[in-house]
């Protein structure tokens, strides 16, 4: 077969035409050194800080890395995975992408690693959206003050150190003092409240993470929880990035108008991992060998927790809004954001339907004519109802992300570098003390130095009305208890304060994995602060509390319903609570024995005052027997 030159040239031309002209240009480099999760790469002169790079191993596998250092002749990158497959001379390719993780409803009930990949053996994540791990925190205008309570189910916290939705509350204490237990109880208590929980385990044992997963599953809490695990066996880069993955997953739910709770257990391990990376990257060390930007490491993470502002629009009646579109505007060309958004939207609506009448209202406001203001507002309100316009709220606004970071201290030293940093960033701290823990006070919360700076605004009025008395009584008890160690004889008032304090301390004790509904907390704390438990022995209070809840649920269920719905303790409700507690106390005393019954009937204060009675009887008996002998 002979081919002519013309045919050959035509074949070549066709082949050239079929070649895709869009050439793909990729910048590649080579590994200079690798070890301890860090690689030095030469040849990526145009790489950007925070960019993902792809390492291609000599054995064919590939790993992702994150550019952290940009130097004159090389780039320092943290490798996400086992570095044993990466060797000197291996190729490294730029991706041009910032690190992203999958987010969405499919993550609920799953255990993922620091890269957002599932590790629970339940198959791949079927998510439609990916989000950047590093984003700016919401600005001032996008936020609103904390006003809704985030009930933890723990009496001592909800009463004296309340947490609100959108708050950042630090849990701090030595190792093995119950920090994780407090966090897990808070997750369990969110069941049925519409709160999505994200638990980030940093540097923990795999067995510990497994226990947490099993406990959440046993209490039906795993269905609304996502576990992000960067365990002790993971490399430092994965432990460093895990909290950012967790908050990114939580932000998805916050930005869809829902409420999320993020727990970082614990940030001390993240700081240690970041210190390791920084030292390997030859960054200058500072205090305790941490790098200079370790404060920013935690501040940019915790600032992403926020209560988002509600957004209102003036629209034509019947208009449906999907929400979440920052560029959307109402018929007045505005989006009314923030604490005064509803007020602003109302004014805009009134101005749209009757500008002349609204001008009169504005003038009346300037002149402070209250009666005229009220009259004009009513007229405009009636016109607004009859108009073709209405005010609607963006359904994806008003969400919240609450952060509960955990910090481990050494021998109770809260003045160390990382604890002081995180204390200054957060809106309060719950301090767990080893001495209290080992003395049987669990949760071992030191109420004296624990504080919530903004949660009080979110606390329900019923709890607020009794919590002030509780904190004061406990403070007096601690002062008196310290004083009584040196005093041999105490007056009746001091003894009564010590007795009251001992009972209040006892009722604040709580078992693990048994969070309490707020109405039950209010009932028992009310009983303690009003002195209704003073006649009961301290040792019986735990059983008394448990049986009191059952009694009220069975005989007086309306009390719990009223507390839950009204959220205020009026005189009638207080009277019914007191009556129910007194009724049950008599029954409890009869079951406990005759001595307690007598104490209830006589209204005796404490056991010490009842003790001399038997001695008096024995003395009279002796004198009577002597008289008979004579």
UniProtKB/Swiss-Prot annotation:
Entry's family note: Belongs to the ATPase alpha/beta chains family.
Molecular function terms from GO: ADP binding; ATP binding; proton-transporting ATP synthase activity, rotational mechanism
Gene transcribed to yield this protein: atpA
Span list, region Disordered: 592-630
Protein name: ATP synthase subunit alpha
Sequence positions that bind ATP: 173-180
Alphabetized NCBIfam families for the sequence: atpA
Site annotation Required for activity: residues: 450
Organism: Sorangium cellulosum (strain So ce56) (Polyangium cellulosum (strain So ce56))
An example Gene Ontology CC term for this record: proton-transporting ATP synthase complex
The protein's Enzyme Commission number: 7.1.2.2
Pfam families: ATP-synt_ab, ATP-synt_ab_C, ATP-synt_ab_N
Summary of subunit composition and partner proteins: F-type ATPases have 2 components, CF(1) - the catalytic core - and CF(0) - the membrane proton channel. CF(1) has five subunits: alpha(3), beta(3), gamma(1), delta(1), epsilon(1). CF(0) has three main subunits: a(1), b(2) and c(9-12). The alpha and beta chains form an alternating ring which encloses part of the gamma chain. CF(1) is attached to CF(0) by a central stalk formed by the gamma and epsilon chains, while a peripheral stalk is formed by the delta and b chains.
Catalyzed chemical reaction(s): ATP + H2O + 4 H(+)(in) = ADP + phosphate + 5 H(+)(out)
Residue ranges with Acidic residues bias: 599-611
Keyword entries, A-Z: ATP synthesis, ATP-binding, Cell inner membrane, Cell membrane, CF(1), Hydrogen ion transport, Ion transport, Membrane, Nucleotide-binding, Translocase, Transport
Entry keyword annotation includes Electron transport: no
Membrane topology classification: Peripheral membrane protein
Higher taxonomy: Bacteria, Pseudomonadati, Myxococcota, Polyangia, Polyangiales
Protein location: Cell inner membrane
